[in-house]
Amino acid sequence: MKTVILAEKPSQAKAYADSFSKATRKDGYFEIQDRLFPGETVITYGFGHLVELDSPDMYDEKWKQWSLAHLPIFPNQYHYHVPKDKKKQFNVVKRQLQSADTVVIATDSDREGELIAWSIIQQAGADQGKTFKRLWINSLEKEAIYQGFQQLRDAEETYPKFEEAQARQIADWLIGMNGSPLYSLLLQQKGIPGSFSLGRVQTPTLYMIYQLQEKIRNFQKEPYFEGKAHVITQNGAFDAKLDPNETRAT
């Protein structure tokens, strides 16, 4: 029986390997020997996302050229691909996953970690006929890692987080792939050259920066007053200043 542990990145895989009795580094993975996993066990890893959503032109050649007539872009199904610079590592991971009896998802314990893991597993065609477990920890200390592997969860418990993350990923794709050409083409019609990138997080953040810059640019100096007092008590005298942030109604 073979167990494959899927980490998110090389440094994470190394931390896992160091927590076991013996680990041997190979090309793109580690071979593990430990009483916790008596059978053949390997740790392999991604480089973060090994799989990306296809660009519009990969669905239809007409979407390669921006045109208002081609908007909106809504594929019937969403497809993924492995970027060229990540194919070597993906193929390493794919071979390990396909030969596994049990897969332990050990990416980061959050939605994005679920997305990274299941995107790789599904793209590798290794999402059926296997036992899936989930490592869920918040520390890379050796003791915490080992304890986490002793208390693996069923992967189905956290699978909804993958679905949430994938929905967010597709929504971001739709906003970017439709909003960017739409606003760029409309601005070009008004004589403003160039292309403009829109994003769910990027655009509101940019607007917040703009608002702050406008406040700085339009700032007007105004006179203000400070309340000060020289206080004399039986124990001595001292100067005091009113702090408006410390005043309280009584």
Labelled PLM ranges:
Residues 1-169, 173, 177, 243-244, ...:
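Intrinsically disordered, low-complexity regulatory segments
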Residues 168, 172-248:
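Prokaryote-biased recognition of long, low-complexity C-terminal linker/tail segments
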